[in-house]
């Protein structure tokens, strides 16, 4: 029956088993805080499962990560980030025999060598300068088939002279910029998403602090974002909040019950907390927002890729430089990590339509690539040259 299915699709007529039912192993750095690497790997995994319906996908995660137990794919859970558990990672690679192993800001030399010995192709994703430097070490360049730089070139920087010389001499790996990981909903779902938000397109401010896992030195960042969102709502601005919502804030959103329900104030009418939402839904909200207040991480670049006017608020150590580059490119304005600064920046843009529209226009003209599609095309090329057929 499986062979009959393959024949029905002309694309797979000459395909090897690994091209039709690839085994993809994702190893993102993971731990008690931050989830950018996991979110990126998950978006690629979901897209891969749609492209290759028979794909086998497996994750390796820290059991301390707040998202670990809710992962939608089979996962091997380790005491901490996979980088620190080479014995377990190597054992999994040797037993499971993936076609491609994707290390996202994680991995050790021994783990990559094990992947090569098993016949797998190796992808390394770097999201920080330190990891990028590691990927350009001579012994890693011989192990990596593709090096994906997680951010756009204007953020991550062009290849240096040294990097270009090394690539010329080594002849590998292939280097690609992922630009932005931006999931998409199915056609026709936009109206349903806006209906759940309770706002029309182009009318609301979207406030997104990020994944909600606390970065060192960023204590109370979520509370500051939420406070800013509530203040904007109280001033009469329709405000959609996507992120962690505590019980106190949720209780303050009640729109009915009680003798005073008929006199709902502006803050309640304009306050639309959604809690966490799927990435694809968030992207649709970004495309529909009048203005976005976001952290300085991947969320900021997603907002820019959606062609939206954006206020960037760095909440982690590595987000400051990213924010500065976006400001320098004229695609975002910056605000400090306190609610008053966020509200002040939002008020200025909401009252200056010319500046807001110009900001959004420059963001749209960047034309950032869809990193998920870049990743899928690269995986398809790697699978064509897989050095072994996936086991049954």
What are the roles of these predicted feature ranges?
Residues 143-211, 244:
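A nucleotide-sugar donor-handling region in carbohydrate enzymes
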Residues 62-72, 233-276:
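Catalytic donor nucleotide-activated moiety binding site of glycosyltransferases and closely related
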Residues 27-51, 59-168:
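Active-site and donor-binding regions of nucleotide-sugar-utilizing enzymes
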């Amino acid at each position: 029956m499986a062979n009959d299915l393959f024949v029905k699709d002309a694309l797979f007529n000459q395909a090897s088993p690994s091209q039709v039912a690839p085994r993809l192993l994702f190893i993102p750095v993971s731990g008690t805080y931050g989830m950018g690497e996991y979110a990126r790997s998950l978006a690629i995994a979901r897209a891969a499962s749609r492209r290759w319906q028979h794909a086998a996908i497996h994750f390796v995660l820290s059991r301390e990560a707040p998202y670990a137990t809710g992962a939608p794919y089979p996962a091997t859970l380790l005491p901490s980030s996979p980088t620190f558990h080479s014995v377990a990672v190597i054992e999994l690679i040797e037993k499971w025999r993936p076609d491609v192993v994707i290390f996202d800001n994680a991995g050790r030399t021994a783990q990559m060598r094990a992947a090569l010995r098993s016949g797998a192709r190796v992808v390394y994703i770097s999201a920080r300068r330190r990891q990028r430097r590691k990927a350009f070490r001579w012994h890693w360049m011989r192990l990596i088939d593709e090096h994906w730089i997680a951010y756009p070139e204007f953020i991550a920087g062009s290849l240096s002279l040294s990097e270009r010389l090394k690539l010329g001499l080594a002849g590998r790996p292939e280097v690609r910029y992922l630009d932005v990981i931006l999931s998409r909903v199915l056609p026709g779902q936009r109206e349903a998403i806006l209906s759940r938000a309770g706002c029309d397109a182009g009318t609301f401010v979207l406030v997104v602090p990020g994944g909600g896992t606390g970065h060192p030195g960023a204590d109370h960042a979520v509370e500051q974002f939420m406070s800013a969102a509530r203040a904007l709502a109280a001033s009469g601005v329709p405000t959609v909040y996507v992120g962690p919502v505590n019980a106190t804030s949720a209780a303050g959103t009640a729109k009915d019950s009680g003798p005073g329900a008929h006199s709902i104030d502006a803050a309640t009418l304009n306050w639309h907390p959604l809690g966490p939402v799927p990435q694809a839904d968030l992207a649709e909200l970004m495309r529909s927002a009048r203005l976005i207040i976001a952290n300085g991480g991947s969320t900021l670049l997603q907002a820019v890729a959606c062609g939206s006017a954006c206020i960037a608020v760095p909440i982690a150590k590595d987000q400051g430089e990213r924010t500065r580059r976006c400001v320098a490119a004229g695609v975002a304005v910056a605000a400090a990590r306190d609610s008053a600064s966020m509200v002040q920046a939002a008020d200025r843009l909401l009252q200056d339509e010319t500046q807001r529209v110009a900001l959004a226009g420059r963001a749209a003209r960047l034309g950032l690539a869809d990193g998920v599609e870049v990743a899928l095309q690269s995986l398809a090329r790697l699978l064509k040259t897989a050095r072994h057929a996936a086991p049954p």
